[in-house]
């Protein structure tokens, strides 16, 4: 059985990259649906805090980025092998 982990990674000028959350999903599509939901919510928050002109966003196949003057907030979906697949 395939599973996907949605990772949210935050990086800033003041700290090393850290994984903010890891959630498991049964399909790539469900992981990316949640990624887009979180991405849109956080983009609104960052635009209010930093100003819309200071925030850029990028969307790739399995990666979503919010970039600010001193940070990057990144979501990625990663396929993982479950114990059932290893047997």
What residue spans do the PLM features occupy?
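Short aromatic-glycine-(Arg/Gly/Cys) micro-motifs in beta-strand/loop hairpins
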Residues: 1-21
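Generic detector of N-terminal low-structure segments
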Residues: 6, 27-30, 41, 73
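Serine/threonine-rich, low-complexity intrinsically disordered segments
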Residues: 7, 11, 24, 29, ...
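Short, flexible coil/linker segments at or flanking structured domains
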Residues: 10-16, 27, 52-54, 68
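A short, exposed loop/beta-hairpin motif centered on an aromatic-Gly-Thr core
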Residues: 16-33
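Short, mixed-charge low-complexity intrinsically disordered segments
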Residues: 37-87
